[in-house]
């Protein structure tokens, strides 16, 4: 038995111990000055992680230790010199260059002369990959009791006189208090032994422990299965697999394998895997409505059949006959490669198409691959198929997500707190796991070179002085059976179809200004039978718009009007009424309240802290500049990049990711990176925009 396998078996034989850890640092780039560790009953705090390593080692003699940290990438960077030399890179997980699970191995100092292990490996998990968002927001969503929840330092910081506004200027005004700036100032100055700081740190650890243990309990998974799930998506897949085994087996019944046929089929289908639809149709909307679909992806997964089983490949006339058969009888499902003409008269065309390095929805002559259902939608809108090249056809379909979604829909609608949040997480995360890329960049120990060479995996050799030895980054394919791209492609296709029908319906009644995956901003109100605040697949009114300024996809400003909204409250019934009239203890009463109009600002690629500093004036200024640039272009003037660039902020200092610094060979994991953000206003958009006339036209495709 190998030493690695022996150590794994010893670790697995021990009971699991869940711990939570948090660090406080002198700003984004400063050193750690306080570290807290909580095991569910006992809390410890020291000024360095090095001091806590001894405590953790003591735990490992009895337990298989799993330490959860919220935003692991940041904390691991801060303690890299204390922990990286012991890294077990083979069993650590890096996703999109971010460390998600970090495992330490054994080193010589952890072994006695008798070769008895006195310290087992420790696994660090990133809780923010299981439940996204700030710890404060998660505590609110999970209804963590006040004595165990994250505390707000605002009053304390104001009392100390260390509060800052959004521009970093001192302030005593609670209304001008900026949380990010003020907390940054506080952590730069505070004494490590200040009671308020230590209570803040303790409750961060306690709150995270409550959240993690709640997740384990609600998931219903054995703890060892839960700990195999590094992300929300992997957790959702595990819950689906364990609780709905028959549906799961159907979902993975398409065997892509590693044959040439499997590679061809997967590549073919992935070309039909498009994302959500985000488009600006007009840049200004003066009065209108903003609607969102309730749980769009969950809904289409619940009510639509998904292809399963072994697909067949057909070409030419056979492919044409297969599609014709499906079109007549709707039996099975599949993907069609064809040349299709989309009428140039359509203001909002139906089919997604990759052009100009964007996902566009053009008119004209398109060559591509789409689901049968989206081709059917295009034909409804007057499209004409000019030639069919080939298709992948699944004879069988099934409602493989109906029970899964229905179960969590019931929990979401009848629960609150942790259960409701968990239900949302499970429904939203599952489908994307089926579309996961098969090949991923993976960091491995240098001992894996031989395996990579045998299997033909490309790799590069690297070295980091803190790690103390060479390692590699390799492109390793996954054999996971749940990688089923046709499922993800079908789910997104169904979602686009539902959105499109909403767009066309509203276009018949007035202007449509904007859409984003599951939302529409438009001039006219939706029909009553399409609207409901909770029902899956129905449209929920998010707000009545006074004004909308839409610059580009995911970059817009909206001002909502004041509204009078009904709400139900529980009112206690007096004992007299209960006794005399046999009334219940509590009764629901409808009342009305004035909701002041709010503002929504989105800006793609800009961190939330900077978006908070924006205002309507910024979006209006950009729009006016776009009109000016358009007028100049129409006059034939040349416009330089400098003239077309609109700066949002300059000189922001950002941290590099832990994996980036590891691969760069740096011994400084706090290396600063200066970032400037802005928008180049002459970039090609997803439609031909006319900012002056407040309209747009779809691009014209000329593929054939």
What are these regions (language model features)?
Residues 4-20, 28-32, 38-704:
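Conserved acidic
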């Amino acid at each position: 038995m190998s030493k690695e396998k022996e150590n794994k078996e010893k670790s697995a034989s021990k009971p699991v111990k869940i711990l939570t850890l948090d660090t406080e640092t002198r700003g984004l780039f400063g050193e750690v000055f306080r570290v807290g560790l909580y095991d569910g009953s006992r809390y410890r705090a020291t000024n360095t992680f090095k001091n806590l390593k001894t405590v953790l080692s003591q735990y490992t003699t009895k337990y298989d230790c799993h330490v959860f940290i919220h935003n692991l990438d940041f904390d691991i960077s801060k303690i890299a010199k204390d922990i990286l030399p012991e890294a077990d890179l083979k069993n650590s997980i890096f996703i999109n260059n971010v460390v998600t699970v970090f495992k330490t191995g054994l080193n010589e100092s952890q072994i006695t002369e008798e070769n008895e292990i006195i310290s087992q490996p420790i696994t660090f998990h990133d809780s923010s990959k299981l439940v996204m968002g700030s710890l404060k927001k998660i505590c609110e969503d999970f209804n963590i009791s006040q004595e165990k929840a994250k505390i707000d330092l605002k009053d304390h910081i104001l009392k100390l006189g260390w509060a800052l506004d959004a521009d970093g200027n001192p302030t005593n005004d609670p209304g001008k208090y900026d949380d990010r700036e003020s907390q940054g100032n506080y952590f730069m100055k505070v004494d490590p032994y200040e009671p308020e700081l230590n209570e803040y740190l303790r409750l961060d650890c306690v709150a995270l422990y409550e959240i993690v243990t709640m997740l384990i309990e609600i998931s219903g998974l054995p703890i060892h299965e839960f700990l195999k799930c590094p992300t929300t998506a992997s957790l959702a897949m595990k819950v689906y697999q364990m609780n709905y085994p028959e549906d799961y087996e159907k979902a993975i019944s398409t065997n892509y394998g590693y044959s040439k046929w499997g590679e061809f089929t997967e590549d073919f289908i992935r070309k039909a895997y498009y994302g959500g639809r985000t488009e600006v149709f007009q840049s200004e909307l003066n009065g209108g409505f903003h609607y969102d679909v309730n749980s769009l992806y969950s809904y289409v997964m619940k009510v639509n059949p998904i292809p399963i089983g072994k697909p067949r490949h057909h070409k030419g006339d056979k492919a044409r006959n297969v599609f014709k058969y499906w079109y007549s009888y709707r039996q099975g499902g599949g993907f069609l490669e064809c040349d299709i003409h989309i009428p140039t008269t359509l203001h909002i065309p139906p089919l997604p198409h990759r052009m100009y390095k964007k996902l566009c929805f053009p008119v004209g002559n398109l060559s591509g691959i789409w689901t049968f259902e989206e081709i059917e939608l295009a034909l409804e809108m007057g499209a004409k198929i000019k030639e069919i090249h080939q298709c992948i056809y699944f004879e069988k379909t099934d409602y493989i997500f109906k029970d899964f979604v229905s179960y969590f829909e019931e929990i979401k609608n009848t629960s609150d707190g942790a259960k409701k949040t968990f239900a949302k997480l499970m429904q939203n995360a599952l489908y994307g796991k089926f579309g996961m890329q098969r090949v991923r960049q993976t960091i491995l120990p240098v001992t894996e070179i031989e395996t990579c060479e045998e299997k033909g995996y490309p790799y590069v050799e690297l070295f980091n002085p803190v790690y103390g030895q060479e390692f590699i980054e390799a492109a390793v394919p996954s054999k996971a059976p749940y990688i089923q791209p046709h499922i993800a492609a079908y789910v997104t296709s169904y979602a686009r179809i539902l959105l499109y029908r909403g767009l066309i319906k509203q276009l018949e009644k007035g202007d449509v200004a904007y859409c984003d995956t599951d939302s529409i901003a438009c001039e006219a109100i939706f029909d009553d039978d399409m609207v409901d605040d909770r029902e899956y697949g129905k449209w929920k009114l998010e707000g009545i718009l006074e004004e909308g300024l839409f610059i580009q996809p995911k970059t817009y400003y909206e001002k909502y009007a004041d509204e009078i909204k009904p709400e139900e409250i529980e009112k206690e019934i007096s004992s007299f009424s209960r006794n005399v009239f046999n009334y219940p203890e509590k009764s629901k009463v409808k009342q009305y309240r004035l909701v002041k109009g709010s503002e929504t600002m989105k800006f793609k690629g800009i961190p939330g802290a900077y978006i908070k500093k924006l205002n309507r004036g910024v979006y209006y200024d950009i729009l006016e500049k776009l009109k000016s640039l358009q007028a100049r272009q129409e006059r034939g003037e040349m416009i330089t990049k400098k003239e077309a660039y609109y700066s949002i902020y300059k000189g922001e200092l950002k941290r590099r990711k832990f994996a980036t610094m590891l691969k760069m060979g740096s011994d400084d994991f706090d290396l600063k990176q200066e970032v400037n953000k802005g928008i180049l206003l002459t970039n090609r958009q997803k439609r031909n925009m006319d900012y002056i006339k407040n309209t747009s036209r779809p691009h014209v495709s000329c593929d054939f």
